[in-house]
Regions:
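Active-site rim/loop-helix segments in enzyme catalytic domains that contact anionic ligands
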Residues: 1-110, 240-241
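Metal-dependent de-N-acetylase/amidase catalytic core
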Residues: 1-12, 33, 82, 93-243
Length: 243
């Protein structure tokens, strides 16, 4: 199994659990080979993705946020990743201009070798679409010589991959990379089980990894693959050969 990228893998997640379901395998594969992975959660998903917690008597917004932060922190640890929280609020995320420069500053510091984030179009959850735009704008601003010129750390051109949305057919998602996560799927499953507020998704994303694994075998001939994750490139890949 090969990791996705050389250098730091940065994952921009709209809510505190998104990175687990959709990119947990890539994160674990990268860190298993000694790579660094850093997850940026724009929000905790406290309003829109924590229904189970809100059913508890006397629950408050701050208590939900604390629970979601604890879950995501444990999940990141299971994947071998660092995690930071912008606490921007969700449903909806705030306007992009409130987050873009903060993200750009983080990208300058992290100097990612690749970035993973949401698909461009998700009519079911526009926070995901907004996270995509915030990510691309943050990358663009971090590349600008006139942004914080005093730090002298202009970002290069890290590739961006979008991970699979919950309803790919409706979100115009067309995978062009199937990543073998067979060896690290136990870590992904452990991370999923940290997200107790969304226990109903554990089985769904286990099944999805198996289905993508079948497709990976079909597309590679490698019958050892059992689990995979699907990604779509945003920018062309630059290579010296066809493979």
């Amino acid at each position: 199994m090969t990791s996705l990228v050389e250098g730091t893998l940065v994952v921009v997640s709209a809510h505190s659990a998104d990175f687990v379901w959709r990119a947990g395998g890539a994160i674990a594969a990268h860190t298993a080979q000694g790579g660094r992975a850093h997850v940026i959660c724009l929000s905790y998903g406290e309003r829109g993705e924590s229904a189970k917690l809100w059913r508890s008597p006397g629950m408050t917004l701050e208590a939900v946020k604390a629970a979601r932060q604890e879950e995501a922190t444990h999940a990141a640890e299971a994947l071998g990743a660092e995690v930071s929280f912008f606490d921007a609020g969700d449903y909806p995320l705030p306007p992009a201009e409130q987050l873009v420069e903060r993200l750009a500053s983080e990208l300058r510091v992290l100097a990612p070798g690749a970035i993973l984030t949401h698909a461009a179009y998700d009519p079911y959850n526009t926070d995901h679409s907004d996270a995509y735009r915030i990510t691309l704008q943050g990358r663009m601003v971090a590349q600008a010589h006139g942004f914080q010129p005093e730090d002298g750390a202009v970002l290069g051109a890290p590739p961006v991959f979008v991970f699979e949305p919950h309803q790919p057919e409706v979100c115009e998602f067309r995978p062009d990379l199937l990543l073998d996560i067979t060896e690290v799927f136990p870590q992904k499953r452990k991370a999923m089980e940290c997200m107790a507020a969304q226990e109903h998704l554990w089985r769904y994303y286990t099944d999805l990894a198996e289905r993508r694994g079948v497709q990976a075998v079909r597309n590679s001939g490698n019958k050892a693959i059992v689990h995979a994750e699907a990604y779509q490139r945003v920018f062309p890949t630059v290579a010296s050969g066809l493979s």
